[in-house]
Amino acid sequence: MNRKISLCMIVKNEEDVLGRCLESVRDLADEMIVTDTGSSDRTREIAEGFGANVSSFEWTDDFSRARNFSFSLATGDFLLWLDADDVIPAASKEEFLRLKERLNALPDDDLPDVIMCPYDTGIDESGTIACTYYRERIVRKNSLPVL
């Protein structure tokens, strides 16, 4: 089985950080969905340069509505969401690829609905991580409720 993982992002005026984020996942995600909520900078151009499917969504001051719109465009079996300033560390890429292999090996009935991923915050000037916690970052597409 070859299950796909779609990266889904909502962005606005993220030209300073978006390229770094997309570079960190370009070899991990099978598809990149970038939903722009009204950028006036080069955000769209940068996303398109990485081969992302870029769409527009009028901002209604509702992150969940924009996120769900992004999810609705994805064709993958699993949806990975990141913010534009998030990065998958190089040291974690092999672990991510092993996760994809494990997902491909599982029968449909055993697939998880949610996958929690480590999330590093509070990185100091020397690069030391001050805090790591787990966040839901990957969800199974067909397990999402239709709202």
Predicted feature locations:
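Extreme N-terminal starter segment of soluble prokaryotic enzymes
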Residues: 2-6
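Short, well-formed alpha-helical segments that are part of the catalytic scaffolds
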Residues: 9-31
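A conserved acidic beta->alpha catalytic loop
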Residues: 24, 36-48, 59, 83
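Conserved beta-strand positions in the Rossmann-like core of class I SAM-dependent methyltransferases
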Residues: 33-36, 55
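Catalytic-site signature of metal-activated, phosphate-bearing donor transferases
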Residues: 64-71, 88-147
